Amino acid sequence: MWMLAVALLHSISHGILTENFLSHHAFPSLLLSLHFSHPSVFSEDLHASLYFVNASLQEVVFASTTGTLVPCPAAGIPPVTLRWYLATGEEIYDVPGIRHVHPNGTLQIFPFPPSSFNNLIHDNTYYCTAENPSGKIRSQDVHIKAVLREPYTVRVEDQKAMRGNVAVFKCIIPSSVEAYITVVSWEKDTVSLVSGPRFLITSTGALYILDVQNEDGLYNYRCITRHRYTGETRQSNSARLFVSDPANSAPSILDGFDHRKAMAGQRVELPCKASGHPTPKYRWLKDNIPWEPDSRFRQTVTGLLIENTRPSDSGNYVCEVWNNYGTAEMIGRLYVKQPLKATISPRKVKSSVGSQVSLSCSVTGTEDQELSWYRNGEIINPGNNVRITGINRENLIMDGMAKSDGGAYQCFVRKDKMSAQDYVQVILEDGTPKIISAFSEKVVSPGEPVSLMCNVKGTPLPTITWTLDEDPIVKDGSHRISQIITSEGNVVSYLNISNTQVRDGGVYRCTANNSAGVVLYQARINVRGPASIRPMKNITAIAGRDTYIHCRVIGYPYYSIKWYKNSNLLPFNHRQVAFENNGTLKLSDVQKEVDEGEYTCNVLVQPQLSTSQSVHVTVKVPPFIQPFEFPRFSIGQRVFIPCVVVSGDLPITITWQKDGRPIPASLGVTIDNIDFTSSLRISNLSLMHNGNYTCIARNDAAAVEHQSQLIVRVPPRFVVQPSDQDGIYGKAVILNCSAEGYPVPTIVWKYSKGAGVPQFQPIALNGRIQLLTNGSLLIKHVLEEDSGYYLCKVSNDVGADVSKSMYLTVKIPAMITSYPNTTLATQGQKKEMSCTAHGEKPIIVRWEKEDRIINPEMSRYLVSTKEVGDEVISTLQILPTVREDSGFFSCHAINSYGEDRGIIQLTVQEPPDPPEIEIREVRARSIALRWTMGFDGNSPITGYDIECKNKSDSWDSVQRTKDVSPQLNQATIIDLHPSSTYNIRMYAKNRIGKSEASNELTITTDEAAPDGPPQDVQLEPISSQSIRVTWKAPKKHLQNGIIRGYQIGYREYSAGGNFQFNIISIDTTGDSEVYTLNNLKKFTQYGMVVQACNRAGIGPSSQEIITTTLEDVPSCPPGNVQATATSPETISISWSTLAKETLNGILQGFRVIYWANLLDGELGEIRNVTTTQPSLELDGLEKYTNYSIQVLAFTRAGDGVRSEQIFTRTKEDVPGPPAGVKAAASSASTVFVSWLPPLKLNGIIRKYTVFCSHPYPTVISEFEASPDSFSYRIPNLSRNRQYSVWVVAVTAAGRGNSSEIITVEPLAKAPARILTFSGTVTTPWMKDIVLPCKAVGDPAPTVKWMKDSNGTPSLVMIDGRRSIFSNGSFVIRTVKAEDSGYYSCVASNNWGSDEIILNLQVQVPPDQPRLTVSKTTSSSITLSWIPGDNGGSSIRGYILQYSEDNSEQWGSFPISPSERSYRLETLKCGTWYKFTLTAQNGVGPGRISEIIEAKTLGKEPQFSKEQELFASINTTRVRLNLIGWNDGGCPITSFTLEYRPFGTTVWTTAQRTSLSKSYILYDLQEATWYELQMRVCNSAGCAEKQAKFATLNYDGSTIPPLIKSVVQSEEGLATNEGLKMLVTISCILVGVLLLFVMLLIVRRRRREQRLKRLRDAKSLAEMLMSKNTRTSDTLNKQQQTLRMHIDIPRAQLLIEERDTMETIDDRSTVLLTDADFGETSKQKSLTVTHTVHYQSVSQATGPLVDVSDARPGTNPTTRRSAKTGPTARNRYASQWTLNRPHPTISAHTLTTDWRLPTPRPAGSVDKESDSYSVSPSQDTDRARSSMVSTESASSTYEELARAYEHAKMEEQLRHAKFTITECFISDTSSEQLTAGTNDYTDSLTSSTPSESGICRFTASPPKPQDGGRVMNMAVPKAHRPGDLVHLPPYLRMDFLLNRGAQGASRDLGLGQACLEPQKSRTLKRPTVLEPIPMEASSTREAQSWQPGAVATLPQREGAELGQAAKMSSSQESLLDSRGHLKGNNPYAKSYTLV
């Protein structure tokens, strides 16, 4: 079957498909696809592509000396074939050595000499093509042009300008090379100019000099050009600028433009510059419409700048210029071209064969363009199925696309020399029909319906037909055909047979065909029934081809099918093939003689039955033409060509065609046909007969053709003949010659020189002589020797050559043949200049001087002319020459054919002008000069002489430097001395002579770094981190200027080390200097050097000196501290030693600090042990106790840092005896035993054992009680029998000691007894507390509770908060502070009673600490504080909070409870901070302290008055000296500098973040006053400085000061004087008024500050008094001396005001003493209390405090709220500062009330205490007077003095005396001052003098106590000599000092008054002791007060403010009473300050 398909395809491919071929043959199950075959130029592979790599390449210009390489701008994938063509379409070829195309498509043109120039190669248009299977594209036209090297010169002309105006220099370039030349730079003398403020180089190459100055005329100006392609540079001549003084003149345009072309999107500058005075103004118009500035248009110094140009910007631009004296305008046209752009749409075209494709090409950038379409590189012309529509042929429409139409389509747009293109690839899919699915072969029975389907795909939609055994299906009732089109575009056809018959069997075929091809499918349908053969049609076969014969069998089944010919079974040869299964016979390569005949098909139906049918095959032979060709013919000849058909069946028809069409009769062609031949005859051949001739032969079998081309050759002939011509010398001439012929003839020119007999020679073509494409000869530059005969010869190898000659006559225009380019003349002498002219006569010669014709009337000029041969010689004489004659002279020669000129530069030489000398740079030992050469006398400068001398010397002793090179314009004078003044001048010399002396300069050299080191450098260590360095300045002659400061270099000294020095810079203070280095390493050896500094730098360093810082305490704790309990009383401790770098000295040992952590949360006594070893065993410890342990190292300087606490518990031991035992009978047989736990548990109590025994007999009973039980009932005892009872505690270590043995007897009438013990009960506040009272007895006793109130017990109040349980316990809920006190429980029955007393102590949160500032630095603040009352619970720690001023953000730090100071680091310099402190105890955090404020050291910057701001000033620069800025102790954060010309409003800003030593202001205006302002900031603030300065004139002179002169008339003098007087008086009055207002404001502010402090004190007083108020009896107070105490750092100021009398009535008394806060549980030593009552005379308004470290306007001691005071105080006296009250009112009555609650036992010693009394006002709603304590840890005398000064400023304290105590360190002072202090917290706050300074006596404020509790109050008394042993050391010494100074009587009185018991509670008040001044004893006697006595206190005269008073404590009384004797105190001295 496939063989049949191949045969069918072969037949169709040859175009021979007979009409009945398919209808007579059946092919079972055969699928055939028939394609119309066409040559394809486009692949269907979508991955193939073409593209451009440089589509913008349109022009290549190169130099003939370099050649060029031009790559083809197209490429593609897969790789493409690249070819180059000329614009005419001719493919180029290689020309050896001239042109070559590389394999990669690069076109190379080699370098060539001018004589080898060829237009076709070196100046032509090319294009290249790229071709691959995707198609073929062509590039845009590329114009390749070679530029020949041509000599040229450029020149610049002199210009004139007015000073302050503008000058424009232009570089004049010859027009022949102007397109290739670019101005690259300008030079001023030999220095290249750079565009700047005054010199601008425009885009066109012009030089603008703005703001012309006189010195601009002293230079020569030249332009430098470069050839764009050859790279050659040219330098123009020198031109000068003549500067004149400004004169009123109308504007004159100096620079403009005629026309300018630009591409859209570019930047264009339209120049317009004019000169005139006054300076003209400019205005631009476009198309006569004023121009409005916008973002694209901007008027600049040079003209109008247009950014991003658009085509709409094209137009006429007018630049109007005007001033007061006239106008001018410049008109130019701007052409903005839009780049050509072509765009094809759609971008992707994918279609099918036969479809329509439309392409559109849109063009931008032009309106009148030429558009053409190309397909695969070939131009597309309309016709057939191609249409090109649109106004500009922009639409391409192609119908019925064939496969060959696919490929690359391009749209080309051309306009002038621009072109653009775009391309798109058109992909054509294969639209040939394809069978997607179809029916299959099947067998059916008669009557069975059958449906056959064919699904076909193709483009365009195919047509489907059905056949049965090659016969069309006839539609009838049982045969129906239908078809549908699916969504995929497929055509589905159905053949439905409803009632199948046997005749319906056979081969069914569906055939689909469209314009792309035909496809068919066939399969056999067998219908059961008797087999038979359907009649077959005869077949015509073509000889030489294959033929298929199908046997049309119907019916099924059958046995076989066989073919016979002439009764012979086929096949019988190799060309015959029989397919038995489907009945098909194939005849290959049919032969007429053999294969023609009758063929029989025999079908075997049954074994013995067969049927047959015959078919006749006729074989026809197609024609065959014998090939023929046209020979070479020429025009006019005769032609005969035969066409012979050598084979083929007759009849044969023969026809002829020309170029595919029938031959028209008008051509005169004769055709003769005879049988199988045909001939073509032409009698007279002409060009019309050119073409392709085709002979076509046809018969019944086929039609064949043969084609041949006829080419008619034409001999050459002239179209334009040459004729004689004239040519002008130097101009171009074209010798015309044009010819035609075929092939195209070749034209050759020959030349014969002269007018004689011609002897023609070939002409060598070159760049000057070129052959044009039409054959004419072009001579670009006619020379005189070109005159002669020229012959034009034409040939093309057809016929004879033709030629024609002509004569060229060369006319010579006037030419200057000889003249001097340059010539020299000496000023004052005669000068002659000649020039020679040549050319056609007559010739006229004239002379010009710089465009001015020289006339005979000019007296100094004489012109003479003479003829010599064919030349004319003209001579110009100048008599005599002057400077102005220098310049350009020109001689002009003119005749009828042209003119010429020769330019002669005449230089008149003379001695030069002196140079203008200026300073370029001044250094310490050299001066750099720069000079501007004036007029050089038109003779090169041969050298310069420079003279220099000291200012004080004469020019006779000058140092001279001769013959400085003339190439230099600057020099440096060296070997000068720094900071010295010199005079300098110079001379210029040329060949003519020497100039005058230049201007004289006076210059002072800069300072140089000192040459000598500082002298006498000494080091003195003053602390562990400080070393004082002292030195003296270097020797005077080595200072090299003024010493501004020093640098100290220091480093850790190491003998072999190489450590770098740390540098510190300081300012100088004099010849002797001192500086202290701080923050050094402790106990470290340092090496130090000192260097002196001046403005120039740093001098040599001094010799290194070594010293060591002092020893200090260690900075780190010992490490790895470990502790282990070894026994119940010992702990073993070990640690590691410190590193050497942290010891800070010589290790003396280690100190171990330890204390017990008690069970109640309290801390035990702090102890310390020292050792020299890194281990220690602590013994004598409490058993089973948790210990805190810290270790520190100490040196000779003291203790170092403690280690972190570690905790270790000692081991368990047997417990101690129970602390107490009670036993009582509850009945006749039962007793109760109660006990207290042991005081020393020594472990965990496991149980208690109760022992009970009776002696007769001795029986001991043991009873066990649980460890948490403290009572036991012993039953079953004998009545009225005594028993011994004791108790033992038991731990894991065993039984402890037994308690005391008590006896008890069971009784029937048992009296009431309380088993609970008396004692102290401690509880936190706001908790519920149960006070137990367990009572026994028979009958059961009754219990009542009482509380001690003012010494009198009273029953407790029972309410909702207080109740008594049935067991006798007293319950207090939510216990408060006022619940503290002594409670009594009384139990009673009929037989007795018992009582216990419980002391309830309520723990509250701690009171607020008193926070002060003790030290500040620039980055840190050290705070100290005194803790307040601990609230009955030890302080557990502190929380310090801080915030920057004006900030809401607070930070916090936890602080150990043992600390009393804290240092905050890394703070901002010079900044205010706020601080608060909160204490915490076991109850919780206490009240926050008052907010205090402190400021770190540092202030805002300031400029030193001793420093000069301006270091140097010249014409355009100012150097500022910034060394004078002092940073104020804080680093500079910003530095802003602004300056502006005086009188203007715009500031020029230069901001710097750091200060350097100097700063230079550049580009200032010459001779102008400026305003300057600086702003320097640091973290503390900002400072500003303003100044004015003036720049110098260009000659170095100064300008007048800023003074406005007023010209006044005589009449106006008097009026002006009066006006001045009036203004002066007004100013004075305004000044006085302002001063008065300022004084009022200052006074008001001070008053407000005082009032604020008073208000703060008022608030504090209210707080204190609200806590301390207690009711008491009224006391009378005797007259006292007013005292005020001020706390200052470690100092006490006792402010004493005498002669103050007051009478005060006190009704409300507050009792505050040290004894109030002692241990209340210990009652062994009761003290007598002396209470002094004092009532404030007025409302308190504020405390008097030390504000030396506080911020102005703030009060560091302000308190806002009240809190419970402390319960324990240091025994040292606190110093209280009294507030300042209002003026006193009328006198009040004082009464005295003495209370002695408990007499002192005989022989007892009073407990030492201090007593204070603060009394509130009677009006409790108003603020109370209070006393405030402050403290600081600082001990400097400066702070003391500052506090003293603050106190003296207070009005009431101006006449006060101040007493202070100065402390010295002693070995025993620390121990003495801390003796007897048991409280851990207070021991840390004791004011022990640790170093020399001012003693500090401070303590916490007192805690308020119950008014009724006076058991522990102390009474001030005079100590007897025997009592001194009980006093602290300082009181002992003070008492001894006071003995003998009126002490006896007063001491006695005081002591008696205090100790004598009284029956009445009202006693006389003892005399108050007064302080005794150092200079004399007090003479005041004590007044005796009687009960009820009344005293009147007089008011102070004129007092504005009231008095303040402070009560004396016991210590103060002693201090007041002691005598001030010298030398007795071992560590203190006292002073009195007045």
From Swiss-Prot:
UniProt xrefs under Pfam families: fn3, FN3_DSCAM-DSCAML_C, I-set, Ig_3
GO terms, biological process: axon guidance; camera-type eye photoreceptor cell differentiation; dendrite morphogenesis; dendrite self-avoidance; dendritic spine development; homophilic cell adhesion via plasma membrane adhesion molecules; locomotory behavior; negative regulation of cell adhesion
Main location: membrane
Domain Fibronectin type-III: 911-1008, 1013-1112, 1117-1213, 1217-1311, 1405-1499, 1500-1601
Glycosylation sites: 54, 104, 496, 513, 538, 582, 684, 692, 736, 774, 821, 950, 1168, 1186, 1276, 1297, 1367, 1514
Localization per Swiss-Prot or TrEMBL: Cell membrane; Cell projection, Axon; Synapse
CDD domains registered for this protein in UniProt: FN3, Ig, Ig_DSCAM, IgI_5_Dscam
Polar residues composition-biased segments: 1882-1891
Cytoplasmic-facing ranges: 1643-2034
TM region(s), chain numbering: 1622-1642
Gene3D superfamilies in the cross-refs: Immunoglobulins
Cysteine pairs bridged by disulfides in the record: 72-128, 171-223, 272-319, 361-411, 454-510, 551-601, 643-695, 737-792, 835-891, 1333-1385
Signal peptide: 1-18
Sorted UniProt keywords: Cell adhesion, Cell membrane, Cell projection, Disulfide bond, Glycoprotein, Immunoglobulin domain, Membrane, Neurogenesis, Phosphoprotein, Repeat, Signal, Synapse, Transmembrane, Transmembrane helix
GO terms of molecular function: netrin receptor binding; protein tyrosine kinase binding
Reported tissue expression: SDK1, SDK2, DSCAM and DSCAML1 are expressed in non-overlapping subsets of interneurons and retinal ganglion cells (RGCs) that form synapses in distinct inner plexiform layer (IPL) sublaminae.
GO cellular component, one term: dendrite
UniProt topology in membrane: Single-pass type I membrane protein
Extracellular side: 19-1621
Record note on quaternary structure: Homodimer; mediates homophilic interactions to promote cell adhesion.
Biological role stated in the UniProt entry: Cell adhesion molecule that plays a role in neuronal self-avoidance. Promotes repulsion between specific neuronal processes of either the same cell or the same subtype of cells. Mediates within retinal amacrine and ganglion cell subtypes both isoneuronal self-avoidance for creating an orderly dendritic arborization and heteroneuronal self-avoidance to maintain the mosaic spacing between amacrine and ganglion cell bodies. Receptor for netrin required for axon guidance independently of and in collaboration with the receptor DCC.
Protein's recorded name: Cell adhesion molecule DSCAM
Species annotation: Gallus gallus
